[in-house]
Curated annotation (Swiss-Prot):
This is Putative uncharacterized protein YLR235C. GO terms for biological process: DNA damage response. It comes from Saccharomyces cerevisiae (strain ATCC 204508 / S288c) (Baker's yeast). Partially overlaps TOP3 and YLR236C. It comes from the Eukaryota.
Amino acid sequence: MLIGAPSNMRLRGALELLWRRLLHGLMQLRLVLKMHICSQLNHAIKRRAFLKTKGGKNALHGCLDTVINLQESILAGIRLVPVLPILLDYVLYNISLGGMTFADFLEVLLHFSALEGLCKGVFEADGLEAVH
């Protein structure tokens, strides 16, 4: 038994090191995604400030176009990183500045079936109902 103990301790140490590196990698990924999301949402909010976009679409459709680009670029990362809380924190801050309404943001976000389950879970946790 004593002979196997150091081997188990080394294995445990190696697993702990691997776990720490994985967590560090996920934190780095979260930071990169957060910066990308903030950049994309900034564009969406700026476009939302105008009544019409270039194609004659209304401001909400302009915002939706930008969020579609966001969704396409980070969809794979959503499975790894809790992106929705980052989105909500950033958007709530910008809503407080008058850039867009929370209802506009929810309409955009709920458009995507890939994110709908996440939104529904957040709403239910807050006692709200996710409705199209």
